Amino acid sequence: MTSSLPSKPIHTIELAPATRLIRVTEVMAIVGLARPTIYKLMSQPESGFPQAVKLTDSTARGAPVAWVLSEVLDWTHARIAARDRVAA
């Protein structure tokens, strides 16, 4: 009988940036912004900052959310590209 379980323990499986969810502390470390600034950017569509993904069906304030790593990295790269266009 074959098993459909992964051959590695789940904590050692690496996820692609497009599927990996990260919590706000990791977002803060990547973009160098404070939590309130991140949420402010999310409320401003023109900022282009990625929206969080709800991790539960809860509508309560403080319900768990996460961001898609690739979207955060794309936003960061876009900020760098914007800087480079201005400098050129």
Language-model segments: which ranges?
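General helical structural elements
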Residues: V24-V27, Y39, S58, R83, ...
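Major-groove DNA-recognition helix of helix-turn-helix-type DNA-binding domains
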Residues: I30-V65
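A short, Lys/Arg-enriched interface patch at domain edges and termini
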Residues: V65-A88
